[in-house]
């Protein structure tokens, strides 16, 4: 597993991964329209333009498996981590390996993460990496077109 800088070529892969209905359902808090390239490109332009963001491409067995990053959440002012792994890489420990390495590179603590309450796979990844549930909130999940429970986790 390798974490490297995101390249323009990676974006097409990330966009294709974002089209997966099962992945969208699990992630829940996704783009309004996962098929909207213009919105996707604008989001990534914003990510690239914000020097407080740290974003990496996850490479597994020589293939782009997904992305991982951290950002200052506008709703809390705290650093949050986020990741997306393509479905063809699920169940291989990719997310756990990537998150372990990524949080090891970040010196800032505490770190926060959010996950749909019923996304047990992602919750397990976060817990394996030392994150603890510290709260819950309700939020509108675009992928489900309804408000759902979201867990807030912290890594000290």
Mark where each language-model region is.
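Acyl-donor (CoA/ACP) binding surface of acyl/acetyltransferases
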Residues: 1-24, 55-156
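Conserved GNAT-fold acetyl-CoA-binding loop/helix
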Residues: 22-43
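Short, P/G- and charge-enriched loop/turn segments at secondary-structure junctions
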Residues: 43-46, 140-141
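Short loop/turn motifs at secondary-structure junctions and domain boundaries
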Residues: 46-52
């Amino acid at each position: 597993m390798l974490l490297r800088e995101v390249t323009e070529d990676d974006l097409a892969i990330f966009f294709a991964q974002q089209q997966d209905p099962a992945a969208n359902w699990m992630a829940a808090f996704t783009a309004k329209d996962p098929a909207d390239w213009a919105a996707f490109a604008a989001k990534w332009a914003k990510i690239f333009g914000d020097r407080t963001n740290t974003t990496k491409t996850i490479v597994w067995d020589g293939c782009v498996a997904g992305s991982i990053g951290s950002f200052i959440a506008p709703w809390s002012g705290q650093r949050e981590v986020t990741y997306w792994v393509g479905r063809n890489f699920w169940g291989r420990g990719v997310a756990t390996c990537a998150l372990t390495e990524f949080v090891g590179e970040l010196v800032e603590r505490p770190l926060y993460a959010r996950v749909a309450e019923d996304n047990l796979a992602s919750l397990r990844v976060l817990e394996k990496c030392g994150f603890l549930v510290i709260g819950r909130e309700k939020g509108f999940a675009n992928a489900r077109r309804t408000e759902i429970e979201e867990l807030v986790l912290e890594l000290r």
